[in-house]
């Protein structure tokens, strides 16, 4: 039986799309199995998000790719619980943190993941074309970079130690990396816990107000099952509403998974009220 990688349909395109995702490229090159897990569309308890993964694990499962917070549903996976189950089977746990890095307080040791990646330009509010990679210290020697450049070393085994093993990528934009440090300093001034508290407050207020309008949500209202991503369920295509949201109300959202709002620390309650008013005005079109 072939080795397998477990992921979900709500992973980012880099992890789940049949065209261009890492697991599917590995499938084409090395013949691994890609197992897609389906989680409940409207979970009411953490266990409902853990069980589908545990049931998908087999003795041939080598890795599980988790999206911490989905940009398609807003669902927040209980990574620590899934990782604990994976660890008993020796399964590598990778976490896509694109929608959690910069939006909540994170302790990667508590999450229990082996690797974690995130882009800098989303909730972290940093530069584009930059991101972060975390590799558990005791796994550095076992993990190979997919691309190397001068500085790697003279043999197949790198001369570099620790994190520098993954930084041998040729010429790079050092100003971009300096901007990452500046952005990290800004987050430190506010405090990760305070950022997470404010994002939860804004997102919860927004979801509750939209639900009170009788407009269905894709995203769970319970903070423990969601993050800052708030997605409104749309009966038809979401792009016309996304364009109207910006043209008529000056609100930049996204059409992925429905009509997506992502309130952050720079938003105020007045902004939330304006978003709710926009949803109310577009309610007939949203409901179809």
Where are these regions (language model features)?
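Short linear motifs in intrinsically disordered, low-complexity N-terminal regions enriched in Ser/Thr
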Residues: 7-9
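Pyridoxal 5′-phosphate
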Residues: 1-4, 13-288
């Amino acid at each position: 039986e072939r080795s397998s990688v477990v992921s979900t349909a709500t992973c980012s395109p880099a992890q789940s799309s049949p065209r261009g995702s890492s697991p599917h490229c590995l499938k084409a090159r090395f013949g691994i199995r890609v197992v897609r897990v389906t989680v409940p569309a409207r979970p009411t308890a953490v266990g409902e998000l853990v069980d589908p993964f545990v049931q998908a694990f087999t003795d041939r499962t080598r890795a599980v790719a988790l999206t911490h917070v989905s940009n398609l549903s807003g669902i927040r996976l209980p990574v620590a619980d899934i990782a604990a189950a994976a660890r008993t089977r020796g399964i590598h746990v990778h976490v896509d943190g694109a929608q959690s890095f910069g939006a909540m307080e994170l302790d990667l040791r508590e999450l229990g993941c082996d690797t974690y990646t995130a882009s800098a330009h989303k909730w972290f509010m940093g530069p584009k074309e930059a991101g972060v990679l975390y590799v558990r210290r005791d796994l550095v020697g076992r993990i190979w970079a997919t691309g190397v450049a001068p500085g790697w070393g003279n043999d197949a085994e790198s001369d570099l130690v620790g994190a520098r093993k993954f930084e041998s990528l040729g010429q790079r934009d050092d100003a971009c990396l300096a901007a990452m440090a500046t952005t990290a300093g800004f987050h430190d001034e506010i405090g990760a816990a305070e950022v997470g508290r404010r994002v939860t407050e804004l997102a919860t207020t927004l979801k509750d107000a939209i639900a009170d309008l009788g407009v269905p949500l894709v995203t769970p209202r319970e903070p423990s099952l969601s993050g800052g991503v708030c997605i409104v369920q749309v009966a038809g295509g979401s792009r016309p509403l996304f364009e109207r949201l910006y043209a008529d109300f000056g609100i930049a959202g996204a059409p992925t998974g429905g009509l997506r709002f992502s309130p952050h620390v720079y938003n105020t309650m007045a902004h939330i009220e304006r978003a709710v008013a926009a949803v109310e005005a577009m309610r007939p079109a949203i409901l179809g």
